[in-house]
Amino acid sequence: LICWDFQHRKECKMEYYSLNEYLRRTFGTKAYKISLDAGCSCPNRDGLLDTRGCIFCSASGSGDFAEHLDMQRILKKTKRGEILTEADQRALRQAVQKQLIAGKARVEKKNKAGKYIAYFQAYTGTYAPVSYLRPIFEAAIEPEEILALSVATRPDCLDDEILDLLEELNQKKPVWVELGLQTIHPATAEYIRRGYPLSVYDAAVDRLNARGLEVIVHVILG
């Protein structure tokens, strides 16, 4: 992952300013991403926009290294507008904690610093009501060794309530929002079944910037 920061570009020994370099400058240490699954689906898979998904996305929503979080019962309750019980919220938090433990175990031998980024990588990480996402994201950033929260999502799945939550969490620990631009060319976007025009992506970036939220752009080279 390339992190473009022209302010520090000349100070870097590499040909580009890497994420590793950015993490060391920002947090003073190396950190590893732990791939997590919030249990969400995607509008490009559940029939809202399409059922086939983007052509580059894997069967697990490209969250291949994350343990699957099966909380459909609780997710359906929030989509019906029901209030989650304390037991529901506790179940969500415990599921995330279990994923964090498993994720840390996978990289602990090579991660001497013991610092991590909680990365909700699978499917669309904000494609759920705030009442469902809040206990999940809060549990992810609770451990001291978690330096930041990173959420992969679509630009058409960032309503004001979601942005309010992310902005609130950003006051506790840095929040990054990873958006799949993939291409700026309409014909290619249609071919890969991205499911939204470039204008939607641009508008989402503007709204995230206005909230002080860091944006990571996913692009396909070639």
Language model feature labels by segment:
Residues 104-115, 121, 126-133, 139, ...:
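Long amphipathic N-terminal alpha/beta scaffold segment
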